[in-house]
């Protein structure tokens, strides 16, 4: 399943994995998963977190390792309901729900994920996605960036 992913996608997932894996032990626990999800404005119960881990935990050790995450991501990317997931992701970034992701909103979410970005890095991320040049990212631009991955 994971062999359908590009090297670039795998590198991005590795980066995301290390954001979740707070103690760097190579495994994501329910506690680490919960921390990241709460920083993204979600509020999963302990049971929901356990279900998410169990869904991917191939070796049954109660945590997610990187190969298990890759399999989950490959499966999710094949799912056709990605439109709804994209809308949900956009809503997480668009804090004031005005239909646009500003540099401040992007910085806020990335900081919550543990990514300390300089103003230049945030501006660069906006510039890369900002097709119409208005200095922020609308939903169409967001989808384009996410689908290009």
From Swiss-Prot:
The modification N6,N6,N6-trimethyllysine is found at residue 116. Belongs to the calmodulin family. The keyword Transmembrane helix does not apply. Coiled coil: none annotated. Gene3D superfamilies: EF-hand. SMART domains: EFh (SM00054). Residues 8-43, 44-79, 81-116, 117-149 form the EF-hand domain. Ca(2+) 4 binds at residues 130, 132, 134, 136, 141. Ca(2+) 3 binds at residues 94, 96, 98, 105. Pfam families: EF-hand_7. Keywords: Acetylation, Calcium, Metal-binding, Methylation, Repeat. It comes from Zea mays. GO terms for cellular component: cytoplasm. GO terms for molecular function: calcium ion binding; enzyme regulator activity. Calmodulin mediates the control of a large number of enzymes, ion channels and other proteins by Ca(2+). Among the enzymes to be stimulated by the calmodulin-Ca(2+) complex are a number of protein kinases and phosphatases. Ca(2+) 1 binds at residues 21, 23, 25, 27, 32. Ca(2+) 2 binds at residues 57, 59, 61, 63, 68. This protein has four functional calcium-binding sites. The gene is CALM1. This is Calmodulin. The modification N-acetylalanine is found at residue 2.
């Amino acid at each position: 399943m994971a062999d359908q992913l590009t090297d670039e996608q795998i590198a991005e997932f590795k980066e995301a994995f290390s954001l979740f894996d707070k103690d760097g032990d190579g495994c994501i626990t329910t506690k680490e998963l919960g921390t990241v999800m709460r920083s993204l404005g979600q509020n999963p119960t302990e049971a929901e977190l356990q279900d998410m881990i169990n869904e991917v935990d191939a070796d049954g050790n109660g945590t997610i390792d990187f190969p298990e995450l890759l399999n989950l991501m490959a499966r999710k990317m094949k799912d056709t309901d990605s439109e709804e997931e994209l809308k949900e992701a956009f809503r997480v970034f668009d804090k004031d729900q005005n239909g646009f992701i500003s540099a401040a909103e992007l910085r806020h979410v990335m900081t919550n994920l543990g990514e300390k970005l300089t103003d230049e890095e945030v501006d660069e991320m906006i510039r890369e996605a900002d097709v119409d040049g208005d200095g922020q990212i609308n939903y169409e631009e967001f989808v384009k960036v996410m689908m290009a991955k």
